[in-house]
From Swiss-Prot:
It comes from the Bacteria. It comes from Proteus mirabilis (strain HI4320). This is Probable succinate transporter subunit YjjB. The chain crosses the membrane at residues 6-26, 51-71, 87-107, 129-149. Involved in succinate export with YjjP. Both proteins are required for export. Belongs to the ThrE exporter (TC 2.A.79) family. One of its GO terms (cellular component) is plasma membrane. It is found in: Cell inner membrane.
Amino acid sequence: MGIINIILTLIEDMILAAIPAVGFAMVFNVPLRALKYCALLGAIGHGSRTVLMISGMNIEWASFCAAILVGCIGIQWSRWWLAHPKVFTVAAIIPMFPGINAYVAMISVVKLTQIGYSEEIFEALVTNFLKASFIVGALSIGLSLPGLWLYRKRPSV
């Protein structure tokens, strides 16, 4: 994969991640002045996950690292613009949720109940369910870690 293709893929990925970030920010009643920052943070988070995946990291660890990055940037922006970090981070993290894996797992459950047990369907169910669960766990833990690190009242040692 050439460098031009990687850059074009990254730009496309970041633009397409900014759109749902703004949409969910509007659903959550984020102030109008913060919408552009939600879009930018969603693009940064999804773009960083894409870069990590292109470099060879699996999607679970890439999502974890991207969520940590989103959390750190959100905390810094909340200090600059005097807003709660969740204003920026929650809407920005939603485009990284594993919708396709969860959908395939759900369809596999429906197929299992409708046509009966099949090893291929059960394998698709378990694989996609576990992948979706680990990605959601990585996103939630990764998003909460910067707050635990940066707002710690006691010394860590």
